[in-house]
């Protein structure tokens, strides 16, 4: 029997420790779960009240952090994570840096309040109950009370809560680093045999993960996303052939399907592997996919959304995907420096700054909130009867928001840890925050740069009016001689017309195809490089390609995927 890798062994141990064989009805106990969750919220908010009362007063906040430097505060989600108070001058990774100007989409000011730490798990027999391990994460507050976490290991800034009250309710649920930590429990645990097979696989070996998925072809993985009550099926495929046999890909013309494979290859700048499709099942049987889960050669997990036919990073590896699910596409906001967000293929973060300023301004509270007002609000949020007077009437809405999918959290009260006498071990000081290369440089001074996208017209034979009557001129100028939609690129300035990027790549063999598309120009306008050997090299290639496309005013060529109402029952339309 072959030995498991270190990552697989850690994941397997975490999975086994969180198993709870009790029936779900005994675990949930809806009213008890709601009351317990409210108790945890009030305990967390009471320990963060020093930050809550000073969140709109930066000088008072800095003085408070300096006075309580080294104090640990218990957090939630996960329950064994803590905040170690520390001023910004004592954190070299952020000292004398303007994180708001380098990362955020809008101007703001960020104040550091401390670093995060984690206590060893209860199952660790050698652990010291008086120690906690610091992590490469800094908790920060903005001028408008928004809570951020800066991860200097991956050089990312996460918006984890809109205010401290929401932070006390959800904890670190929206912090990406949580799901990279080996102690974080898995959200996806069923079917048990399927999950066990993946946990025994090296998460950095994309070919092995795809092979495991291929062995389960046609089966479903129950994907759970933390903070959400509904589940989603992941239909296992594991191969290009299996993908081609599923709708809507089986109704795509061969040329369009080949273009889709080449688009993914050129977007990733490396080889890739299919895992499966996420979506939902109709009552009468058919599976309606919303995206394709795939891996690059380094094991990073991406989702190709059918809605806009583009790729988005959803996890660093498949083990992390089993912990976070689709959280990165359900509201997790990550801000990157310079071009790195485009290089990592992160989804464009949603800007909440304008909305929050407008809300404060509408209530006449912009820059006028006093400490006495915050004290009154805190008195209301911490009222003793909140656990009973806020019980919802609809029991179906009582979904858990805790990371632990069972009642195991009740066995480990996160405020019972002796936080007044904790010794913290320093975290690793290195990380991507030290990088200063092409991926960290801005493009024309743009923040949160992403390549603009072109959405192709619908795949229909002829234009119709709103009543369904065919209009004259079916062979319009929007389609070329082959009947396929003509590529239209939005351009900046007066840049001359140039073919889109996927037509200018060097010939590349893609899994499931015999070769790449033919180049339309005698000389490719974008740099063509060798296959990367590290993820950092892939980032550099993606960044150079994005800058070259931006300089020429090109957009991403989206490959049209047929909608359900455009698919007949006789297979793919051969075209006119």
From Swiss-Prot:
InterPro entries assigned: US22-like
Gene name in the database record: US22
Domain of life from the UniProt record: Viruses
A GO cellular component entry from the record: viral tegument
Pfam families to which the protein is assigned, alphabetical: US22
Localization of this protein: Virion tegument
Keyword Transcription regulation: no
Biased composition (Acidic residues): 566-576
Biased composition (Basic residues): 542-555
Family from the record: Belongs to the herpesviridae US22 family.
Designated name of the protein: Tegument protein US22
Broad class of where this protein is predominantly found: virion
Ranges where the record places region Disordered: 471-576
Swiss-Prot/TrEMBL keywords: Virion, Virion tegument
């Amino acid at each position: 029997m072959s030995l498991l890798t270190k990552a697989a062994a850690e994941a397997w141990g975490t999975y086994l420790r969180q198993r709870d064989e009790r029936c779900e009805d005994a675990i949930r106990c809806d009213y008890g779960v709601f009351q317990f969750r409210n108790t945890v919220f009030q305990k967390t908010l009471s320990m963060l009240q020093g930050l809550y009362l000073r969140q709109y007063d930066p000088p008072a906040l800095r003085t408070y952090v300096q006075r309580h430097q080294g104090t640990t505060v218990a957090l939630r989600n996960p329950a064994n994570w803590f905040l170690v108070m520390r001023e910004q001058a004592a954190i070299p990774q952020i000292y004398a840096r303007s994180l708001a100007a380098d990362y955020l989409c809008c101007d703001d000011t960020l104040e550091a309040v401390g670093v995060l730490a984690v206590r060893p798990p209860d199952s660790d027999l050698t652990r010291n109950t008086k120690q906690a391990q610091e992590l490469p994460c800094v908790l920060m507050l903005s001028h408008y009370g928004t809570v951020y976490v800066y991860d200097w290991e991956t050089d990312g800034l996460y918006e984890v809560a809109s205010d401290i009250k929401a932070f006390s309710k959800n904890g670190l649920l929206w912090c990406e680093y949580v799901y990279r930590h080996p102690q974080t429990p898995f959200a996806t645990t069923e079917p048990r045999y399927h999950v066990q097979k993946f946990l025994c696989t090296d998460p950095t070996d994309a070919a092995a993960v795809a092979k495991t998925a291929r062995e389960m072809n046609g089966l479903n993985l129950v994907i759970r996303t933390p903070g959400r009550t509904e589940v989603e099926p992941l239909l296992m495929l594991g191969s290009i052939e299996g993908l081609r046999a599923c709708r809507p890909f089986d109704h795509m013309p061969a040329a369009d399907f080949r273009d889709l494979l080449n688009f993914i290859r050129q977007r990733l700048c490396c080889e890739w592997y299919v895992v499966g499709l996420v979506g939902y099942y109709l009552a009468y049987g058919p599976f309606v996919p919303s995206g394709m889960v795939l891996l690059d050669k380094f094991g990073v997990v991406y989702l190709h959304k059918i809605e806009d036919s583009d790729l988005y990073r959803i996890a660093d590896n498949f083990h992390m995907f089993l912990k976070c699910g689709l959280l990165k596409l359900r509201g997790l906001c990550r801000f990157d420096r310079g071009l790195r967000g485009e290089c990592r293929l992160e989804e464009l973060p949603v800007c909440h700054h304008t909305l929050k300023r407008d809300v404060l301004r509408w209530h006449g509270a912009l820059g006028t909130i006093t400490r006495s007002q915050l004290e009154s609000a805190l008195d209301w949020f911490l009222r003793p009867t909140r656990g009973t007077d806020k019980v919802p009437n609809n029991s179906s809405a009582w979904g858990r928001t805790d990371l632990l999918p069972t009642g195991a959290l009740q066995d480990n009260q996160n405020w019972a840890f002796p936080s007044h006498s904790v010794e913290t071990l320093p975290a690793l000081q290195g990380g991507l925050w030290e990088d200063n290369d092409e991926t960290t440089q801005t493009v024309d001074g743009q923040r949160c740069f992403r390549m603009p996208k072109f959405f192709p017209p619908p795949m229909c034979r002829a234009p119709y009016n709103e009543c369904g009557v065919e209009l004259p001129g079916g062979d319009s100028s929007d389609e070329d001689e082959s009947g396929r939609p003509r590529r239209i690129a939005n351009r900046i300035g007066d840049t001359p017309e140039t073919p889109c990027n996927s037509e200018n790549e060097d010939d590349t063999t893609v899994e499931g195809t015999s070769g790449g598309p033919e180049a339309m120009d005698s000389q490719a306008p974008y740099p063509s490089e060798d296959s990367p050997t590290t993820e950092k090299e892939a980032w550099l290639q993606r960044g150079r390609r994005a800058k070259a496309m931006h300089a020429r005013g090109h957009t991403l060529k989206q490959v049209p995927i047929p909608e359900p109402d455009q698919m007949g029952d006789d297979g793919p339309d051969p075209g006119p």
